[in-house]
Amino acid sequence: MSDNMQDTNGVLVQGHIKIFDPESQKVYINKRNAIHYENMSIAMAESLANAGEGFIYEMSFGNGGTSVDPTGIITYLTPNSTGTNASLYNQTYTKVVDDRSVNNTDPARNKLETRHVSGTNYTDIVVSCLLDYGEPNGQDA
């Protein structure tokens, strides 16, 4: 084997978020979403080495990342995606999406799926998280 051999394929991670009403199918948001690359690299290494907690367990929600002025203009703050302690601006709610966890109260609708097409060099992870009527409890819609 040659010492000059290099694998240049690399790894590409892209985030995407789609928020929609499951009853009416109305789509509210369908766009690219920020990735925390340092945490993703740690998660991938821990998953492949079967060491630590490099898996998706929960989805967190919050506020403070956007503001709306009196004329309706929406301003988005820069995502907190640097440093291992980076987090949402103001986390207000968390829901378990690991459908193998005993802490998941609705694994049929809050779940993880992998989707792969044979012959391609990518696999999608689809995270489904349903915020039902009255969730989060005590917060206005």
Located regions from the model:
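Small cysteine-rich, disulfide-bonded extracellular modules of the LU/uPAR three-finger superfamily
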Residues: M1-A141
